[in-house]
Amino acid sequence: MEKYENLGLVGEGSYGMVVKCRNKDTGRIVAIKKFLESDDDKMVKKIAMREIKLLKQLRHENLVNLLEVCKKKKRWYLVFEFVDHTILDDLELFPNGLDYQVVQKYLFQIINGIGFCHSHNIIHRDIKPENILVSQSGVVKLCDFGFARTLAAPGEVYTDYVATRWYRAPELLVGDVKYGKAVDVWAIGCLVTEMFMGEPLFPGDSDIDQLYHIMMCLGNLIPRHQELFYKNPVFAGVRLPEIKEREPLERRYPKLSEVVIDLAKKCLHIDPDKRPFCSELLHHDFFQMDGFAERFSQELQLKVQKDARNISLSKKSQNRKKEKEKDDSLGEERKTLVVQDTNADPKIKDCKLFKIKGSKIDGEKAEKGNRASNASCLHDSRTSHIKIVPSTSLKDCSNVSVDHTRNPGVAIPPLMHNLSAVAPGINSGMGTATLPIQSYRVDEKTKKCSIPFVKPNRHSPSGIYNINVTTLVSSEKSLFRASKKRREYSRTDVHLPELNYNHLPELRALEGTARNSRLTKKESKILSESRIPSLAAIDLHTPSITLHQVSGPPLSDDSGADLPQMEHQH
């Protein structure tokens, strides 16, 4: 029963209660009848088992549909389709009675449903307005089969029968234990006048008072019932009332038509053996006039189909609602994850972004790289102001499909942005800024913050990299302008850090050639002072220039900035 959500109490009786519930899985609204603890009360258990047994074998458009049966903690639970409207509700809304056409449709379906039960040798025994449900489409459904039972075999007697007094047949009131389908027909006769007039036909306060109302309208009981009355110990010392003047139905309800009075009289015949069967009632003139029975039978089928569609649409609507709620919850979870990711450590976040972007096509990476290259950052310090020009990634440069001759703007790999490495990394003989190169995969997460000092304008003889001389000159001027003192140092004392060309074999070979050239010149001439040449005068239009050719006589600096001198202790 955990799959049902309680929506409120519908009704309560001496044997249990009925609650309105919603199925959490399908969203269908149901009515659950919860009996009292049946293991402690044999009567409750008997009523529950009887209703379960009968409703399992009764399936009809005018009978309430039993959906499920379960037992939990000594209690029986019966799950029915939910119909929240009854004929009693109509009578309370219209105390002066219902319209003729409405009563005609209701009675046709009531008799049809009871006739189906009788055809299966089952009598309801508790027909009354509150036990007759009406759906939104106008389909009538009989409910509450707690007092229903199969017909007794010959010689068998009925026991434990307690029904609503106002609708009890005379044979039930006097205690006859051999009754049959006629008790339901009597109840139908009581409903006929009540639905038309809005008031109960025989509103007795007790069993003897009920007999009095019946005898006032219909006359004396049959001899057999009178005998049973005087033998019944319940009526010991009580005599049947003497009726001096009767009040028949036509006098009591003069506004009712003759056909309605005739239908009621047939159902309310004082002798149960003379009451008609339900099949005979359906052929009464009340239903056959103007072809109502045939016409309404077709209309009833459409109403039943409409109710079935409404149930199906309700299920689909609930399923769509659940799917939407599920999608909304997933969306909220995604939003939560995004918020958590933005609050995470920047390095971890960038790493995650890198993994995601790595699976995309090269065109997207190139587009993002171009957008990133349009940004610039400004590094401020006490001694220098350097404008950093972002570069594209090494991965883009290492692409062999790139024509470096036609695309001189291809960027060099990202460089470390430790400015202290600039001074020892400048070679007067090489004319290049050599900084330790880190792994591309490590620097990828910080490539947006890389600080390249040079921008390629022409590729080197190796066909891989080129240095933008103009950018280097402006950087040199900014660095040298900050220094005020000149210090002397020997060219032999200058030790350049070795580049780690793990993934650039051609540059490593080029570095060896440059070293040999520098050692040869060292033997012939020792310079006591060395200036880092300005590259402003180098012919930028000579594509065959090599790195060792950059070394030579110092070029004059247009700005007149002095070179910094450093003392090296060994």
Swiss-Prot record:
Keywords: ATP-binding, Cytoplasm, Kinase, Nucleotide-binding, Nucleus, Serine/threonine-protein kinase, Transferase. It is an enzyme of class 2 (transferase). It catalyses: L-seryl-[protein] + ATP = O-phospho-L-seryl-[protein] + ADP + H(+); L-threonyl-[protein] + ATP = O-phospho-L-threonyl-[protein] + ADP + H(+). ATP binds at V10, G11, E12, G13, S14, Y15, G16, M17, V18, K33. It is found in: Cytoplasm; Nucleus. It comes from Macaca fascicularis. Residues 320-334 have a biased composition (Basic and acidic residues). It comes from the Eukaryota. This is Cyclin-dependent kinase-like 2. The active site is at D126 (proton acceptor). PROSITE patterns: PROTEIN_KINASE_ATP (PS00107), PROTEIN_KINASE_DOM (PS50011), PROTEIN_KINASE_ST (PS00108). Its main location: cytoplasm.
